[in-house]
Design a protein with these regions (language model features):
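Solvent-exposed adhesion/ligand-recognition segments of exported proteins
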Residues: 1-188, 195-198, 209
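Binding/recognition "hotspot" determinant
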Residues: 87, 151, 191, 196-237
């Protein structure tokens, strides 16, 4: 049984946002589920040094946000967004929300670069925003000029990677930095949108069935070259 926080006043409204800010030179390694006791709340893990998710997920959290950005606040103390300058989020091994216990509607992955080598699940929407950005709480990104070395790919999904949700939205904002899918499985019950401010390389596995599927529209946009190999299946018009 998960005990509630005894420092919170039970006569006041429950927490809506739970921020776990990590100050470390090492990436956070999350190998289990984070459970919210009481009313549903957004769970945020922020570590500029990076985050490794291997069997991570949330229970009783409407929204799960993993970010390498530094949280920014409004004058009233509410969360304004994140300043992302560095750090990689890696999803591997046991994946994210792979356990049937999860009831997470929204998953946000906000980092300089994101690597997907296992499955990611959310009931309503998966949003990935990669690049050096200021990102608000609605995942709207404003790019920050960068003078340091850039990653080769802002978002890189391997053949063992996958995403399963209603809406799937992936955007790489950094100029000249690409987005790549190396045969990972995509299943969007509604729409799939992928945008790259560099090249976009989208490879589907060599099977009879399309491994990129959406019941609605599929949108692939690239500032530079767009290379697609394999099958796409869209139920949109």
């Amino acid at each position: 049984m998960i005990q509630g926080n005894p420092n919170l006043d039970p006569n006041k409204a429950p927490a809506r946002v739970i921020l776990n800010e990590v100050n470390s030179n090492n990436p956070s390694q999350i190998k289990g589920f984070l459970e919210v006791a009481g009313g549903k709340a957004q769970v945020i893990v922020a570590n500029p040094s990076g985050i490794i998710c291997n069997g991570c997920g949330t229970i009783n959290a409407g929204r799960m946000t993993l970010t390498t950005g530094k949280p920014q606040f409004n004058q009233d103390g509410s969360l304004a967004g994140y300043q992302v300058e560095r750090g990689v989020i890696r999803v591997e091994g046991g994946g994210l929300n792979a356990d049937s216990r999860h009831d997470t509607q929204y998953v946000d992955l906000l980092a300089r670069a994101v690597e997907i080598n296992s499955g990611v699940w959310a009931k309503e929407k998966i949003a990935i925003v990669a690049g050096k950005n200021k990102v608000d709480t609605q995942n709207k990104a404003t790019p920050i000029e960068s003078q340091v070395a850039q990653p080769e790919f802002a978002i890189d999904m391997g053949q063992m990677g996958g995403m399963y949700s209603g809406y799937i939205h992936m955007v790489g904002t950094e100029k000249g930095v690409g987005v790549r899918n190396q045969g990972g499985h995509i299943q969007a019950d509604k729409t799939l949108t992928v945008k790259s401010n560099g090249q976009l390389v989208w490879q589907s596995a060599k099977t009879q069935e399309a491994v990129t599927q959406a019941n609605g529209d599929i949108t692939l946009l690239a500032k530079d070259n767009l290379i697609h190999q394999g099958k796409l299946h869209s139920g949109g018009v």
